[in-house]
């Protein structure tokens, strides 16, 4: 029998064999119901009618949290309910009643709760029960200025485990996407009728060059984009679409590669611009020919920038003054800095060099610290607190940071050519993008591929096409996770003392 016909039985009071009284202490509701439908739809009533004397009763009284919402749960046995459009408090109260009656219900985890009701919200979640969904809901609604000392340690640890503080940004020449690691799905996509080149994303802002040498900023929150013109005094800057973009949110500044025509040809520059005034601040690097790719490593807090053109130069970010230079004539140079910005590593993709190597330098003075005997070419390097990670097209190499010894080599020949690797801060996973648009996940403890190692399904591949680039990015829970970690660290220090 359809739900529509069940509804006719209920609304017309046909063939009812039981009066059900729902009482929350303030309001009492009496319903004419059918035991067979209660039994079929509720584990609570199954247990009652199988094991207790109520199976013989014509009237049953039950104490509930909320009589009106409990009534809606019972009515859902007869006709379709529309809970998803209700306010946050109703949805939570409905979930509490479905749990009581043993009725399957999927809670909308995107519920938004007003700041002033957060404590009430947490109390209701406690009645529903803690799981990944409800803990995620709490983290999503947690105010940044909330007193975390109200929560016990195991609860805060549960909040961290239930969610990640990063997402994955992927792009190709006409589109870009955001993949939620927590939800295991794409949560944002944008298609653009222009051919897009190098991009940079910071939280909600995405900066990209287009085929028309213009810079576009996309805002994820508003789902809108705008073109940006930048100037050197009154002269409009022409961008190098094959170059680099590096956005500095703390200063609202952006570093770009651009082209300046001269009487002898062109100067290819890398410069800092203010997005407030749209004006050039300073130029870090200039060359008058298409040469080696310019590589950037930047830390505003450490006041350093590393650029590579004809050689590697370490400069003060604030002044542009060169601190020291390292001769590096090979092509395909890659650079990575340690998390504390005390050292940096230089590797090369040059196949003509007989003895491939990774060299570690001191960032304070440019002195050579260590040379790693690396026999294969290198496309890129990452430096985490635990490993220096290098890769070429087929292999990934893990060197320990405490002794610079090779501890693992992962062969990816059977998975496709490696395009890029990335790891968010010191997270437990390294992500690998291959040329067939497959994304693999490596556990940083075991240094093995995980079982869930491909986020790009065949359907996704058909709809989207090949990805050109990806990056792990902060998500909306990043700052909250940092505050929770800080609170837990303070408690551990207090426990030790």
Curated annotation (Swiss-Prot):
Disulfide connectivity?
none
Which family does the UniProt entry place this protein in?
A: Belongs to the mimivirus BTB/WD family.
Question: Which superkingdom, per the lineage?
Answer: Viruses
> Which residues are the signal sequence here?
none
Q: Which PROSITE patterns match?
A: BTB
The name this protein goes by in its record:
Putative BTB/POZ domain-containing protein R738
The UniProt record lists the BTB domain at 16-86
Instruction: Please report the organism this UniProt entry assigns to the protein.
Output: Acanthamoeba polyphaga mimivirus
